[in-house]
């Protein structure tokens, strides 16, 4: 039989693994531990697409490899199952989001199992399970006790259509919501915040210890955004009021010609003159409709309004006008800036637009034409004149501190984490607000605070979550008769995913989040694979919670994930017209090797793009598994290119991977397997073991598969195959194509045991060199023969072999041999006359 039947083999082995608990996490204390973690998915209604298995296959290959190397392997899977889509679906259909979520999880699990991943399902977690979110709530109560969870009246990104506020990170650059693309408006609301800023310095510094892609570390550094500079206090003319600005360039204070406050700044209404009151009020309203991202877009037109008030520049006593402008955010820094238009592009554009004074304080450039943003000696700066940047900053900070009008200051771009959502489908926040004005956390003995089941999950309309409608759940009375009201906000989806990797370590513990000894044994996670889109949010939040738990003594390590790897994106086949617009695949036909728009007849260019329903180019893994088999999908996704590259899906590539597996099947089913080693495959076999082992360590799965192909080609040229090499090859194949490998192992090793824990093959360094070499035989300097001989023969042995060769014998039959020159491993030159 020339091909194998994947429809028979794959379900057979999946059933075997499940029945035998083959992938139960090892607990042998004499073995090293290896923790391979996937970013767990949100179980959407659409199910898996072929992008999901790329990362999952990578961790699965490593897990199977490490088991064979004698490690205890923790390789778990779970569900990040709270979130807006389930709630939106429930509102649209009237169904319970819990039912919808359970159906989706069952479908995801079916699809994942069909791909042959070696998960330990005894450790499955689900963020919506009360036994799980009991500990999410417990972490929150600890944050609350330590003052790191607090309530504040803050301007939030309110999305009317979603009935909830969303975090800054969930607002797109165009000012719409990441989920749904709805308009986002700013409005002040009582919100729960987590004080992630208390950990800013540690979150920044500890990045140095991590084996993460530098690009991800840079994104976190930029998000944390550490700046060293000075706070400067400006008094407001004719009042007893003042405001503080933070600047990284206090040395340019002599060039500050106006100040700008955020429209939401507390002083705006106090200092605005009667003449400017209406203009200021109108501007404040307009600013409230924009997201932070839209307001700070560098490309947008500069807008602003003068308040009618003046500030006093502390260094020279000059009166400078105070404006409001939406590019200054109340939530960033002090909500006020000093503007030095000569040396800042945004300030320069603003000054030009509103005809404000521009005074150069650094030499170089022509500030009439553009802001000069390079460095140079100070000018127009009194006691700083002639100094360079570093010396001038130091001198100005000393002056500010001496005069009592400023001080050195470190600030961070990082804001505290907006932690509440006005939705139903999330973890209830375990806080009770009492009528006497106090608030307390729900005691640990009463956790979990279970989300009540209700059919009425529409937003309350008051800005509170639907939980505000459930009075039986909402209202509580203390033993002393004081009445209270439960917190109605729920936690964001990020909560459950900030610590799930800890629960996998001890998922059934009812007494604590996880056992200390087990945490010590498994942390930090050895390899975490997932999409780069989680660079800032999830990874930063998880690091914050981990550090907090480290401070509590709950976890033994400072960081959760030692090595992080981002797989690339699998792109779909798509087509562009002459305008660059994408055309859905069902509107395209292929003629004579070219592609055409069925409706317009226009020839189209093939161009990979992100898979999407609208382009009708989403590939469902169910279809691939049915037609080609799970092993083919696994091998193809690992062979299509480097794991971190984004590559277009190709049906031809898929067929190529299947053909390779069929060749493997034929080789091991038709070739005579022998117990005596002829030595013919020594070099290629040992090279293959060495190469595949090294490439697995480096996550270079495509080159590992290429080496397996080299071995198959070499083995096919031989009449017989040494059985030990056949077995070793099957072991090397097993992490990539586990079903086929199990089937072949049974036949070749003549066993009914799984291959999963068979010791990984080793290679012999001495076999990596050629046993034979090709030498040339020359007569009078001309090549007359090429001979394959044993390596490292002596000069005498080479001479003997050359002179005994039939062809050479006939060439020199009637000639006298004058001299024979032999060079070992290279040539024999025969001089005749």
UniProtKB/Swiss-Prot annotation:
Documented EC number(s): 6.1.1.4
Motif ('KMSKS' region): 610-614
Matching InterPro entries: aa-tRNA-synth_I_CS, aa-tRNA-synth_Ia, Leu-tRNA-ligase, Leu_tRNA-synth_edit, M/V/L/I-tRNA-synth_anticd-bd, Methionyl/Leucyl_tRNA_Synth, Rossmann-like_a/b/a_fold, tRNAsynth_Ia_anticodon-bd
NCBIfam families (UniProt xref): leuS_bact
SUPFAM superfamilies listed in its UniProt record: Anticodon-binding domain of a subclass of class I aminoacyl-tRNA synthetases, Nucleotidylyl transferase, ValRS/IleRS/LeuRS editing domain
Swiss-Prot/TrEMBL catalytic activity: tRNA(Leu) + L-leucine + ATP = L-leucyl-tRNA(Leu) + AMP + diphosphate
GO molecular function, one term: aminoacyl-tRNA deacylase activity
Keywords: Aminoacyl-tRNA synthetase, ATP-binding, Cytoplasm, Ligase, Nucleotide-binding, Protein biosynthesis
Organism annotation: Streptococcus gordonii (strain Challis / ATCC 35105 / BCRC 15272 / CH1 / DL1 / V288)
Cytoplasm as UniProt keyword: yes
Chief localization: cytoplasm
Gene3D superfamilies given in the database record: HUPs, Isoleucyl-tRNA Synthetase, Domain 1
Protein name per Swiss-Prot or TrEMBL: Leucine--tRNA ligase
Places the protein is found: Cytoplasm
Entry-linked Pfam families: Anticodon_1, tRNA-synt_1, tRNA-synt_1_2, tRNA-synt_1g
Protein residues bound to ATP: 613
Family: Belongs to the class-I aminoacyl-tRNA synthetase family.
Root EC class: ligase
Keyword Cytoplasm tagged: yes
Gene Ontology biological-process annotations: leucyl-tRNA aminoacylation
Positions of short motif 'HIGH' region: 41-52
Gene that this polypeptide is encoded by: leuS
Gene Ontology CC, one term: cytosol
Highest taxon of source: Bacteria
